[in-house]
Design a protein with these regions (language model features):
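Binuclear metal-ion centers of metallo-dependent hydrolases, dominated by the metallo-beta-lactamase
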Residues: 158-181
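Short glycine-rich or small-residue beta-strand-to-loop segments that form or flank ligand, phosphate
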Residues: 11-16
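Conserved alpha-helical substructure of the radical SAM core
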Residues: 1-10, 24-27
Length: 181
């Protein structure tokens, strides 16, 4: 890409699995940044993360070393977050939220679904808005599922409802929010 002069905006850690689970994450971030400086000096280095490991010191250092941090939080309280996310293992909600509050300049991503689990109900949206206001991200990306999930009881949220959620968040908190569909 560098030899072909293809512009690169951001080199992003993401994929099938959670990148913060890698045992050598901190070293990988520093090596990718070194290579970025050499080949794509104007590109950012970022990560998409479910935030469950952000409390670990090495992970927190790696995340702070990045220019862009996309961190997920799909619920305004622990019960809804667990219902939507279905995390593996024992993830401590309060620890995860504290870590999100301590990370600088994050972009929060929140997925909304309807069906047996529905995090678009007015009461839950108010809880979520309060939480996002406490976390104080740079911005929020609101989205829904884009293909049929393994659990057929989850359904996508209409675009108009996502736009209402994003607008309400911005109006109440002043935090920019945009809908990805």
């Amino acid at each position: 890409m560098a030899t072909q002069h293809i512009p690169v905006d951001c080199i992003t850690f993401a994929g099938n699995g959670e990148p913060t689970l890698h045992p050598d994450l901190e070293e990988l971030v520093h090596e990718v940044k070194r290579l970025r400086h050499q080949y794509f000096p104007t590109a950012d280095v970022g990560m998409l993360s479910d935030a469950t490991q952000a409390h670990r010191p090495g992970v927190a250092r790696a995340l702070r070393a990045l220019e862009v941090r996309y961190m997920k939080c799909d619920g305004g309280d622990e019960a809804m977050w667990r219902a939507v996310t279905q995390p593996l293992g024992s993830v401590a909600w309060n620890t995860m939220i504290a870590a999100l509050k301590n990370l600088p300049d994050i972009i929060l991503q929140s997925m909304f679904i309807q069906g047996q689990v529905d995090n678009t109900q007015p009461g839950h949206i108010e809880t979520w808005i309060r939480l996002v206001g406490e976390i104080r991200p740079l911005s929020v990306q609101v989205y829904t599922i884009d293909r049929a999930p393994a659990d057929s009881r989850a359904h996508e949220v209409p675009l108009a409802r996502l736009q209402e959620i994003a607008a309400r968040l911005s109006q109440r908190t002043g935090i920019p929010a945009e809908v990805y569909d």
